[in-house]
Amino acid sequence: MKRSYQLFGAVLLSFFAACASAQTADLKALTSAMKQGGYVVVFRHGATNRDQADTDPLTHDNVAKQRVLSTSGIDVAKQVGAAFKKLGIQFGNVYTSKFNRAVETGKLMSGGEVSSTLDITEGGLVVTPIENDRRAEALRKLAGVVPAAGKNTLIVTHKPNILDAFGKDWFEVKEGEASVFKPDGSGKAVLVARVQAVDWIKAAGN
């Protein structure tokens, strides 16, 4: 019986090792393809301070009353930006929510300025359900727009927007997680991969 458990454990370890190897290979292929442009990367903003809340959610320039990036969130976003640069992944248009945590994530990851828009800003309970639906549709449409030649598009938004736009499979979308889409040319965004922030950093180090 003990030998059976040992054998099962060895098989299980081999399975997980094979999965990890396949995921690494897949990400390597993806980052290589992204050098040519044509992808839309939708990020949930970076890690935030969990003891903060948006106490003035309708005044987007009132940063003092927002949940903002944590020290770790800032550091990881910088590292992801450095990884994109090292990997040769270039962004043309960079769109963010109007909340500071999204704006800063976009700036740190792209290394440049961003266009902040209400279309991908979290509305929550302070806007109407109709407006939340409009924003979800706006995010879906934006993810389906083909980027300029040789460039990728970067979008930084929020969990509710991502969940509303793309469905229940994103219920557990993490802070700093990216969903990489390939627009099909007819306005539809085709999901290619979901990548955690740390995996971009690892890919650049390989």
List where the protein language model places each region.
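Bacterial N-terminal signal peptides that target proteins for export
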Residues: 1-9
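Generic beta-sheet signal
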Residues: 38-40, 148-157
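Active-site-proximal alpha-helix that buttresses catalytic centers in soluble enzyme cores
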Residues: 24-127, 133, 169-206
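Glycine-rich phosphate-binding loop signature in dinucleotide/nucleotide-binding domains
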Residues: 87-89, 146-150
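Bacterial N-terminal signal peptides
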Residues: 9-16
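A short, acidic, amphipathic alpha-helical segment used as a generic capping/interface helix at domain edges
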Residues: 137-147
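Histidine-centered catalytic micro-motifs
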Residues: 43-48, 155-162
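Sec/Tat signal peptide C-region and signal peptidase I cleavage site
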Residues: 18-22
